[in-house]
Regions:
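Flexible helix-coil transition and linker loops at the boundaries of alpha-helical arrays
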Residues: 28-30, 64-69, 101-120
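Alpha-helical segment of the N-proximal tetratricopeptide repeat
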Residues: 36-58, 62-65
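Terminal, low-structured helical/coil segments at or just beyond the last alpha-helical repeat
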Residues: 148-183
């Protein structure tokens, strides 16, 4: 299970991980799998974790937020839901937008030294999720580049280690969707 806590005092919900609806076949259980990370307390997060991706997308589309970190969680969850439903063009677009939003959040946090390292983890999530989508789209070079960036931002994060290992063994199927109570 991959968990992170956001230190802004906003939402703090326990994180869980589940096997996704697009899990690999039983024969592939021992091989490491790519992992998507969603924000359970972001728009659509609980539905994503329950494997109700269409319902999650509906909830996400209806959600309106004022805070930039809430928007980042929303668009990240949209990226994950589209990837899980194998709508790769939409997933790629959402992942790109989640990355832009996470970068903007990080730039705002750089004013506060303690917030910068936390934001690095959130930015690593955006890169790692986009890497999964790149692997699904059979673009391993772009995926490797994104995972290298994720590793440089959060070298000890479990989702980074798992995705790097999965890439090394050429396993590009999604086995898990993980939630973090970060936004």
């Amino acid at each position: 299970m991959f968990t992170q806590k956001r230190h802004t005092g906003k939402l703090a919900i326990a994180a869980t991980s589940i096997l996704s609806a697009v899990a690999a076949h039983a024969a592939d259980v021992t091989a490491p799998k790519m992992t998507l990370t969603a924000y359970i307390n972001g728009a659509g997060g609980e539905k994503v974790m329950a494997g109700k991706f269409d319902e999650a997308l509906t909830e996400i589309k209806k959600a309106r937020y004022l805070a930039s970190d809430e928007y980042t969680a929303k668009i990240t969850n949209q990226c994950v839901a589209y990837a899980a439903t194998k709508l790769l063009p939409q997933a790629k677009s959402s992942c790109d937008e989640a990355l832009r939003a996470a970068k903007a959040d990080r730039m705002g946090a750089l004013r506060y030294s303690s917030g910068a390292s936390i934001q690095n983890g959130y930015l690593a999530i955006a890169y790692a999720n986009r890497a999964v989508v790149q692997m699904m789209a059979k673009n391993p070079e772009a995926a490797k580049s994104d995972m290298a960036r994720a590793k440089s931002l959060a070298p000890d994060a479990g989702f980074v280690s798992q995705n790097l290992l999965a890439m090394e063994t050429s396993a590009s199927k999604i086995a898990q969707i993980n939630a973090v109570p970060a936004r």
